[in-house]
Each structure stands twice: as C-alpha cells, then as structure tokens.
C-alpha cells in the first residue's frame, strides 16, 4: 500500500501528500486498515489490473454522532497508467452504491480546483460543487491551489 501511495502521490500534484510522506510502518498501515474493517459502515475498494494494484476508492464515516451519521467522505486514486480506462467511474459507482446500502445519504469530497478531469467525472456522477477553500494546498514550489468541496445526496 505504501508503494502504491508513493507512486500515485508522485504522478500528479492532485494528491494531498508527497511521496516521501507515504512512509507508514507496516504496523500503522495494518492498524489503519483494521480500523476501517472494524467500522460498520466505512470501507475501501481496490482495483487490480493483471494482478497489480492500480486504483482504490473508499468512504469513511465523518462521525458516528447522530447529527452527522448520514455524512461520509470519499477518497479515490488511480495510477496514471490506468487513466482513461473508466476505472475511476466504475470504482466510484460501486462505492456510492455501497455507501447508500451502508446508510449514508450524503457523500462529500474535496478536489484540487485545477483538476478538471476529476471535477468533470464527479459532476457526471451527480456531485454538486458547494464551495471553494482558497489556498487549501501549499505546494513545495510555494504556490497554492484551491480546493473545491463537492457533495452528492444519495436519497431517493
């Protein structure tokens, strides 16, 4: 998993971390995955191409408090070599379907404002842009990027 995170984090600036920040110990990674497995509604799907991990998409409960139980955050990453295959769309469709089955009625995500490809996909899947956080990300070169907050409601 660390290797996958390092690779995807280095392929584009659209990830929230740099490759050198993906250095979880095996124990920490296992603990993180176990916590997700133990949570009754949070989950992650992985995509493999010829036995190689090329994508993952997951949903995490934002809170277990009653007033926020309906909300989940979504994260996704796809290796560049698998871009354009429809994998992101497929993973997100499956994750959104499962999120609804798990009782979530609202799924939220944040995306780099200059990531037009991702924003297009999210809008195509029914997400709506709700706001923008200026200078949410500071890159190593000293420049900043805004973050667009998006939401999809899963109610019938």
Regions inferred by a protein language model and the residue ranges of each:
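Short amphipathic alpha-helix that is part of the acyltransferase structural core
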Residues: 1-24
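Acetyl-CoA-dependent GNAT
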Residues: 9, 21-81, 92-93, 153-155
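Conserved GNAT acetyl-CoA-binding A-motif
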Residues: 92, 99-110
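Terminal substrate-recognition subdomain of acyl/acetyltransferases
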Residues: 141-156
């Amino acid at each position: 998993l660390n290797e996958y995170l390092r690779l995807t984090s280095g392929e584009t600036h659209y990830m929230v971390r740099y490759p050198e920040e993906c250095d979880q110990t095996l124990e920490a990674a296992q603990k993180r995955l176990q916590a997700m497995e133990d949570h009754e509604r949070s989950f992650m799907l992985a995509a493999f191409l010829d036995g190689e991990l090329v994508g993952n998409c997951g949903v995490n409960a934002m809170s277990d408090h009653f007033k926020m139980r309906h909300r989940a955050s979504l994260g996704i990453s796809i290796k560049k070599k698998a871009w354009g295959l429809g994998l992101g769309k497929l993973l997100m469709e499956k994750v959104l379907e499962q999120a609804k089955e798990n009782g979530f009625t609202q799924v939220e995500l944040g995306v780099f404002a200059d990531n037009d490809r991702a924003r297009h996909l999210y809008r195509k899947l029914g997400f709506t842009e709700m706001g923008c956080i200026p200078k949410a990300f500071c890159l190593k070169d000293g420049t900043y990027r805004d973050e667009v907050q998006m939401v999809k409601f899963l109610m019938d």
